[in-house]
Structures are given as C-alpha cells and as structure tokens.
Regions:
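Intrinsic low-complexity, disordered N-terminal segments enriched in polar/charged/small residues
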Residues: 6, 33-36
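Low-acidity, Ser/Thr- and Arg-rich intrinsically disordered low-complexity segments
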Residues: 2-5, 14-22, 26-28, 39-44, ...
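Non-catalytic terminal extensions that flank enzyme cores
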Residues: 39, 45, 49-108, 132, ...
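Short secondary-structure transition/capping segments
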Residues: 172-187, 209-217, 237, 242-245, ...
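Alpha-helix initiation and N-capping motif
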Residues: 149, 174, 197-200, 212, ...
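Active-site cores that bind ATP or allylic diphosphates and position pyrophosphate for catalysis
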Residues: 198-343, 350-355, 406-407
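N-terminal Rossmann-like or analogous alpha/beta NTP/dinucleotide-binding catalytic cores
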Residues: 65-208, 305-306, 310-323, 381
Length: 407
C-alpha cells in the first residue's frame, strides 16, 4: 500500500479498485511504450541523480520499491550523534515544523476566493506553530507585471497575513526548473509534442478533472526524422510520459486529502502524458510548483479544490525527481450569489472593492470567517484572533462550494 493511500485498508482497496474499473472503462490506444524493464532502469537512473537543488534537511525519504511507483513520504530525522544521551536516544523524533505557503499569481487583483485560500493556509500553519513562505507565481506573460505583484503583497500585509520567508519570484528560478527538466529528459521520460490546443480540442477527447483534454499520445512514438521535420516548422512543447494503461499497479496515484479524503487517479486514462514545458518555452505549472515546494521546504499545501485534480501529477513528478510529498488540503470554492465561481477576470469581489466597503481588515476577515463557518459569527476579528477558531473539522463539514451572501 502506498504511504499516501486511503486511511484504512478497506477504503484503500475500494479506492484502488474504483480506479482500475474507471481505467478499464476509459482505456484507449496509445503510442509505443517502453517495456517494464526499460522503464525501471530509467527510473533507477533518475533516482540516482538526486535532488534538483539543495533542500533544507527537514526530512528524509522513506522510499518504497521504485519499480512499483509507490509514493515517497517525508519522515522526521532522528539524531545519530555519538554523544546523544541515553535519555534522548530512545525518544521519538521531533516532528519537522509545518511550512505552509502563499503562491498567488499577479494576473489581477486578489478576489475574495483568493483571500479565503490565503487565510486558510495561514490559519492552518499558525495553528500548528508553523511558518509561511510567500512565492509569486509569475511565469506566464500575463503575470509579469511588477505593479500587480506589489499590489498583491500590499493586500496580504493589509490583511495581517504576514509571512516568514520570501517573497520569491518564479521568474528568478528558471535554472531550477531547467535542471529538473533535464533530469526527466536524461531518463528518457519526456518527448516533444507538436499538437496545438486547437488540435487537441478538435479531437473531441475526454477531459481531465482540470478541464484539459486527456492526451492520447499522438506524438509519443514519433521517429527522430519526423521530430526534426516538425521542429523546423513549429517549436514543440515537452510532455512527460506516464505509465501505460496496462500497467495499473504503476499507473494509479493515491493520496489522502485533508478535506476531501482518499483520492486516486489512473494517470494514463484520466490525465495522459502531460506538459512540463509549453511550446513558447514557459515551464508548466506542474513542474514549477513541485520544484519550488521542495526547495522551499513546504510541508503543507492549502489551496482551492479546483486544483485537486492537479495533485496526482504533482505527486508523480515528486516521485520521479526524488522530492518529498507535502500534505495536501484543498478547500471549497467561493461562489457568487448567482452561482458563478469568483474570477479575477470578472473583477468579482476584488480586494480593492472589499477594502473600500469594509474599511478595516478585521471587519472583512470577521465577515469572511463567519460566512465560511470558520468562526461562529461575523464579528470583526484579526487573523491572529481567528487562529483559535480554525479547525480542519470545520472545513471538512463545509466542503461543498460556498455561496457568498450580501453583508
């Protein structure tokens, strides 16, 4: 059983069985697949390369059989110093400190849903005596606006959601993503893909949980000559191979989400080979966040449930790169009164309007905490005052998307 399987053997068996049934119903033709022996050799080669960047010694990895692709889990390190006292030699290891993170994208003004996500991440870390890292995810061209990043940082400070480390900017960390990509390429786990977005959608393929078409491997088996010919016409993207559909023991990724419980995904049938770099050279979200979370020592990821479907891909990447897997906790989305998901594009309840309306961070946070069930009422409260009210049991009890009502 994977260390990130369901909470009980019975639930784990049920979850795994459901994934296999779902995979069988949705199986499809795929390109040439390396043999199990070849893939095992490549994975061993990849594992021997080590981490992509120095990582603080917060944890070591307990690794299952790499051929089975079980997920690695971080465990606390016990001291082996020769002068350790007898009294402490048999004591349990001190748990590693909780490290949470804010990872907003400066693509527009924060809206109420972004505030809720940051608040939950902050409250969870602080309630466990942990730390917060601030990372600005600005790889995409639409996010490369310094004034929006500065506004985002100012908004977090106004809310009283202080951080202990950062801000880090992804645009300054491209060498780390390049190193990780080279590890995957050297192991033979990637290939160039020339499919356009229009071509993928035109194929009428089923879609993954995040809305992207499930990739059927059109470019997986291209010859070197064909790759050269197409490269002369169009810059390719880079895709990561996932285990074949007939390799279900390898294909299923299982983990337990702190809010939504046992999760499993058969990568081949529910995701397909996925992008690690776009055709314009921008590193894909999945690769960048995996590298950054590990390099920054993040042990807990709190984010909206719209990213729940990305988690199996990130766990798979963590395993291939020899990186620890943090604990995942996804939270419900906030919806407008007419049932729409809040969006920066639509300027729904953005923080500029909210600051003007509520006047103080205490009034806004108190109202938000009361609306989402974190606090028993909408009394104005500071973020620090909300720590005593925060509980993951409350979040689990309200895990359906939350419709916000007028004050």
């Amino acid at each position: 059983m994977s260390p990130f399987s369901a909470e009980t053997p019975a639930v784990a068996k049920s979850c795994r069985g459901f994934c296999r049934l779902r995979a069988g119903l949705r199986s499809s033709n795929r390109g040439a697949e390396p043999t199990a022996g070849t893939r095992s050799a490549r994975l061993r080669q990849l594992a021997s390369h080590g981490n992509v960047s120095p990582i603080a010694p917060r944890a070591i990895l307990v690794r299952m059989d790499i051929n089975a692709l079980d997920i690695a889990t971080p465990v606390a390190v016990t001291s082996t110093a020769p002068n350790a006292s007898a009294a402490t030699a048999g004591a349990p290891a001190t748990p590693a400190p909780v490290v949470g993170r804010f990872a907003p994208s400066p693509s527009g003004r924060m809206h109420l849903g972004n505030v809720f996500s940051c608040l939950c991440a902050w409250l969870s870390a602080r309630s466990q005596g942990g730390h917060i890292v601030l990372r600005i995810e600005d790889l995409d061209d639409r996010c490369k606006r310094p004034e929006l990043a500065a506004q985002l940082i100012d908004d977090l400070a106004w809310l009283g959601l202080e951080w202990d480390e950062g801000p880090y900017y992804q645009r300054d960390r491209l060498d780390l993503y390049e190193a990780a990509l080279h590890q995957l390429q050297d192991a033979g786990l990637t290939y160039p893909c020339f499919c356009t977005r229009a071509e993928l959608h035109a194929a009428s393929a089923p879609h993954a949980s995040d809305g992207t078409p499930i990739y059927r491997g059109a470019c997986r088996g291209l010859s070197a000559e064909e790759i050269a010919r197409r490269s002369a016409l169009r810059a390719p993207a880079t895709r990561l191979r996932v285990p074949a559909v007939d390799d279900l023991a390898d294909d299923v990724v299982e983990f337990v989400d702190r809010t939504y419980g046992a999760q499993c995904e058969a990568l081949a049938t529910e995701c397909g080979d996925f992008l690690v770099r776009r055709s314009d050279g921008v590193f894909a979200y999945q690769l960048a966040v995996v590298v950054d979370d590990a390099a920054m020592g993040v042990t807990e990821v709190v984010r909206g449930c719209d990213l729940l479907g990305s988690t199996p891909r990130q766990i798979y990447l963590q395993h291939l790169l020899g990186l620890p897997t943090p604990r995942y906790a996804h939270i419900p989305l906030l919806m407008s009164p007419d049932g729409r998901r809040l969006s920066k594009r639509d300027r729904d309840l953005d923080l500029g309007e909210l600051r003007a309306h509520f006047g103080t961070p205490e009034a806004l946070l108190g109202w938000l905490a009361g609306q989402t069930g974190i606090a028993p009422d909408t009394t104005p409260r500071t973020a620090e005052q909300l720590v005593e009210h925060f509980s993951w049991d409350v979040i689990r009890a309200h895990r359906e998307n939350i419709t916000m009502t007028a004050e």
